């Protein structure tokens, strides 16, 4: 939210208060679900620092991690209302408003981060989504970052898709994750994230799927000694700003914010890419066996789900899927 300080500055000076202790011209807020130990928070810190430095102190950004301001859906609404200035959201999260945006999270549709970038910025579907974010939702997309790829841990080795059969797999209560478990032959078991460790420890479930950073942060490797590199869903993270905030900034400060968001996204991406490489080694040292099953049967198993997605989303979903499949290697 903009904090107008120029009038306050003039008043304070007239009262003899030093301008050095006064607030910035623009006092802004950045809300996120991620906690303070996350890569997202580290990148947001870099963003806030660069904006302050490059704006010569005119813009001050305060960070609100750990869903202090609500979940991502609530924060997107706050951006539209102008009560929050910045937040993160995955491209697929916009299925809340446009069902066809779920294409970004369909298992095995986005094969790598380069494809994720092209899907958002180069396809007609992606370009149209960015326009709708602006026009309908009141948010401007500043940049996109890589946010990890989901893998599968379990209490038995997964050497092929056959080993998924009957596996009680914890997934979040999201259609695409549920579909991954179902169509590879596992038994999808949705439950709250906070309950997963105990469920794995007591064998109430046989496995779970998450990016490697989450597996480490939640210490799932303590109670799961097998990790299959299933690479089933790639996550991105969008840096978003409220239109109300962005349009009130003069052009030179808009550029400062845009450039800082792009730099932060590069750092954000590097944290995840480097982290994933290091984590494989870390898990091996913890006694976790890493397997690399043939992913062709996994991908083939998803075809009925793609047909279901097209049936649910109609021509828009079918077009989006075809456009992204056309840029996959």
Swiss-Prot record:
GO terms for cellular component: outer membrane-bounded periplasmic space. Gene3D superfamilies: Bacterial extracellular solute-binding protein, family 7 (3.40.190.170). InterPro entries: DctP_fam, TRAP_DctP, TRAP_DctP_sf. SUPFAM superfamilies: Periplasmic binding protein-like II. Residues 1-23 form the signal peptide. It holds the Pfam family DctP. It comes from the Bacteria. It is found in: Periplasm. Keywords: Periplasm, Signal, Sugar transport, Transport. GO terms for biological process: transmembrane transport. N-acetyl-beta-neuraminate binds at residues 33, 72, 90, 150, 170, 210. Changing residue 87 to R: Complete loss of incorporation of N-acetyl-beta-neuraminate into the LOS. Part of the tripartite ATP-independent periplasmic (TRAP) transport system SiaPT involved in the uptake of sialic acid (N-acetyl-beta-neuraminate). This protein specifically binds sialic acid with high affinity. N-Acetylneuraminate (sialic acid) can then be incorporated into the lipooligosaccharides (LOS) as a terminal non-reducing sugar, protecting the bacterium from complement-mediated killing by normal human serum. Is essential for lipopolysaccharide (LPS) sialylation and serum resistance. The complex comprises the extracytoplasmic solute receptor protein SiaP, and the fused transmembrane protein SiaT. Belongs to the bacterial solute-binding protein 7 family. NCBIfam families: dctP, TRAP_S1. This is Sialic acid-binding periplasmic protein SiaP. It comes from Haemophilus influenzae (strain ATCC 51907 / DSM 11121 / KW20 / Rd).
